[in-house]
Amino acid sequence: MHAGAIGPLPVPSKSGSEQLIRHASLYLLERSLVRKGFDELILSRNPNDWTGFGPALEQWIEDTGKNLGHAALCAAGLIDFDAIVIDGALPAKIREQIVAVAQRHFAGLDQRGIAPLKIVAGTIGADARAMGGAALSLMANFAIDRDVLFKEAI
C-alpha cells in the first residue's frame, strides 16, 4: 500500500512529459553537487546545513518547486484537497523555499475546475514518508472511523 505515490505523476519536460521523480528528487541535487566536486554523501552527512552549495542548490529548489506545483495541480484534478504538504529530509529553510516556488508556480497555472487549496510546508522532516505510510495503514486496519484523519482542515 502506498501513502500516495506522486513520483509517477506527469510533469512537463523538453520531451513532452516525464515522471515527477525525474524532476523533483534529492538524487538530482546529489548528482549536481557531485558534478561540482562535492562528496556524494554531503547531504546525509550535513542534513540540517546545506549552506555553501550555491547555484546548484538554487537551481534544484527552483526546479523542484516548479514541478511540485505542477504535480499539485494534477493531484487536485483528481481529489479535492484542503492542502498539499511538502515535507521530507531537508532543512526547514530549504523546504520553505521549495514551498514558496511551488505556490508561485501553482498560482500561475490554469486552475479552472480545481477546488482552492494551499501548498504548505510540513514539520515532520525526514520521517514524513514513513509516518505517512504508517498512519494510513494503521487507520485502514484499526480505526473505527476511517475518515477521522482527514476531517480536520489544515
Feature-to-residue mapping (PLM):
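ATP-binding/phosphotransfer module of carbohydrate and carboxylate kinases, centering on a glycine-rich
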Residues: 11-154
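Phosphorylation-prone, low-complexity intrinsically disordered regions
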Residues: 2-5
